[in-house]
């Protein structure tokens, strides 16, 4: 039971965190990364992580 629970929590967490991050990084890097500096990209990533975790 413990293994199943661990796998479930990890899978849901990873799936939710991994896919959006990839899409965000790709979309952000194409549009904002070129225009602004690395600091901005980090901020966008952080905001997205917070937004996703709340969702």
UniProtKB/Swiss-Prot annotation:
Tell me any Pfam family this protein matches. Answer: TP1
User: Which parts of the sequence carry Phosphoserine?
Assistant: 9, 36-37, 40
Kindly indicate whether the keyword DNA-binding belongs to this entry.
yes
Tell me where it resides. Nucleus; Chromosome
Taken from the UniProt entry, a GO cellular component term is:
nucleus
Q: Which GO terms describe its molecular function?
A: DNA binding
What InterPro entries does its record include?
Answer: Nuclear_transition_prot1, Nuclear_transition_prot1_CS
Coiled-coil segments on the chain, per record: none
Q: Which UniProt keywords apply?
A: Chromosome, Developmental protein, Differentiation, DNA-binding, Nucleosome core, Nucleus, Phosphoprotein, Spermatogenesis
Q: Which cysteines are cross-linked by disulfides?
A: none
Stretches the record annotates as Disordered: 1-55
Report the superkingdom from the record: Eukaryota
Assign the protein's first listed, main location to one coarse class. Answer: nucleus
Keyword DNA-binding attributed: yes
Which body tissues produce this protein? Testis.
Which BP terms from GO are recorded? chromatin remodeling; flagellated sperm motility; heterochromatin formation; negative regulation of DNA-templated transcription; nucleosome disassembly; positive regulation of protein processing; sexual reproduction; single strand break repair
Instruction: Give the similarity note.
Output: Belongs to the nuclear transition protein 1 family.
Role of this protein? Plays a key role in the replacement of histones to protamine in the elongating spermatids of mammals. In condensing spermatids, loaded onto the nucleosomes, where it promotes the recruitment and processing of protamines, which are responsible for histone eviction.
Q: What is this protein called?
A: Spermatid nuclear transition protein 1
Q: Per the UniProt entry, what species is this protein from, by scientific name? A: Ovis aries
Q: What gene is it encoded by?
A: TNP1
């Amino acid at each position: 039971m413990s293994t199943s629970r661990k796998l479930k929590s990890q899978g849901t967490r990873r799936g939710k965190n991994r896919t959006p991050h990839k899409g965000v990084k790709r979309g952000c890097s194409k549009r904002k990364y070129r225009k602004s500096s690395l600091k901005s990209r980090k901020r966008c990533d952080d905001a997205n992580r917070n937004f996703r975790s709340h969702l």
